Structures are given as C-alpha cells and as structure tokens.
Amino acid sequence: MNVLRKIVKKCRDEDTQKPSPVSAPPDDDDLWLPPPEYVPLKELTSKKNMRNFCVNGDVKACSPNGYSFRILRHILRSFNEIYSGNHRMIGLVKVVVGLALSGAPVPEGMNWVYKLRRTLIFQWADSRGPLEGEELEYSQEITWDDDTEFVGLQIRVSARQCHIQGRIWCINTNSRACQLWSDMSLQTQRSEEDKDSSLLLE
C-alpha cells in the first residue's frame, strides 16, 4: 500500500492546491440520453450577448492502475460543489472540460492528458456570464481515492475574449461531451432567436 501511495504522489504536481475529495462511484454506469436543449447548433443569426473566447483546456487524468470513464463521470457529478474558479464562467469551464475529455488523450508517464485549443462562440442568457473583457485562469485538482484505487483529475482552463472567428461549441447530441455536460449539470436553455442554439444560464 505504501508503494502505491509513493507512486500516486509522483503523478501529482507539487504546486497544486489541496485536492477536493469525491465519494465512491455507484456500480452502474447507465448510458445517458441528452435532454432536448442540447441540440446541434447551426449558424447563429442573433448576436445578443454573444462572445468569442480563445480557450485552452488541459485535463490530466492520473491513475497508477488505469481508469475508467465511469469514475471520471462520477467525479464530474460533484463539479458544482467543488468548483473553485470564477462562478461567472463556470458554464464556460464545463463546456471546455466536456469537449476536452471527448477527445483523444496523450499518454504522459502514468498520466493521460486531454487538451483543447480552440476559439469558441458562447452565448449567455440575460445578464449572465463573465463581465466585458474578463479573463479566466482556473486550475484545480479533484481526486477519488480508496484503499485499492486512486484517480486524480488536474483541470486547467484559461479563456480570454478575442476577435478571431470562433466555432459553435455544441456538438453531436449523442457525443461523450453531452454526457459529461449532463454529469456536470450544465445549465442551458434554447434560444428564442435561434431555435437550434443553446444559451448558457451559468
């Protein structure tokens, strides 16, 4: 057991803040079907409260014995309670984390690193979302641990408003990203101006 603890310590960054623990995952891992507000987005006609952000997202999954998406999804279900970043941008962070984890990981020692570098278009409902010109630098480690297994997620997201042409962030409703957004309780509503688009409520 002590050997496992030493191995685990090596795949954590020494400069990260104290990780947030998460309770044990359930045994079942039912396939989640997306709610109707997650719809494929087409070209937006409304420019109301629409902003382009250049985003960088890194999610590093650390586990000496490998990991399953069942555990990652369980960790993300506690996201609202353990999120330590700017709450005006929590919706943006959830979108970036979901898109990053739906990509292919790059092995890095005993870590698996998911990266996202993209300019994305976000729309917030009413007066929600970040302040004009507001930027985000968010970093947090979240862990799940018991006597036999350890899984740590190191999440880093940076975002700044930019004028480069962006892409719509919503993708195939049957994608892994939509499952992860549901796990993180991403709050959206259908736009009245663009019936095929979703507005962030957080």
Curated annotation (Swiss-Prot):
Pfam families given in the database record: Rhabdo_M2
InterPro entries (alphabetical): Rhabdo_M, Rhabdovirus_M_sf
GO molecular function: structural constituent of virion
Entry keyword Membrane: yes
Record GO biological process: viral budding via host ESCRT complex
Site feature Involved in the inhibition of stress granules formation and contributes therefore to virulence, where: V95
Ranges for region Disordered: 12-33
Impact upon substituting D27Y: In strain: Isolate AVO1
Keyword flag rRNA processing: no
Region (Essential for glycoprotein binding): 115-151
Subcellular location: Virion membrane; Host endomembrane system; Host cytoplasm
Consequence recorded when altering D58E: In strain: Isolate AVO1
Location of the motif PPXY motif: 35-38
GO cellular component: host cell cytoplasm; host cell endomembrane system; membrane; viral envelope; virion membrane
Assigned keywords, A-Z: Apoptosis, Host cytoplasm, Host membrane, Host-virus interaction, Membrane, Viral budding, Viral budding via the host ESCRT complexes, Viral envelope protein, Viral matrix protein, Viral release from host cell, Virion
Record membrane topology: Peripheral membrane protein
The family this protein is said to belong to: Belongs to the lyssavirus matrix protein family.
Role summary: Plays a major role in assembly, budding and uncoating of virion after membrane fusion. Completely covers the ribonucleoprotein coil and keep it in condensed bullet-shaped form. Inhibits viral transcription and stimulates replication. Plays a major role in early induction of TRAIL-mediated apoptosis in infected neurons. Inhibits the integrated stress response (ISR) in the infected cell by blocking the formation of stress granules.
Oligomer status and interactors: Homomultimer. Interacts with nucleoprotein and with the cytoplasmic domain of glycoprotein. Interacts with host ATP6V1A; this interaction plays an important role in virion uncoating after viral entry.
Name by which UniProt lists this protein: Matrix protein
This protein's encoding gene: M
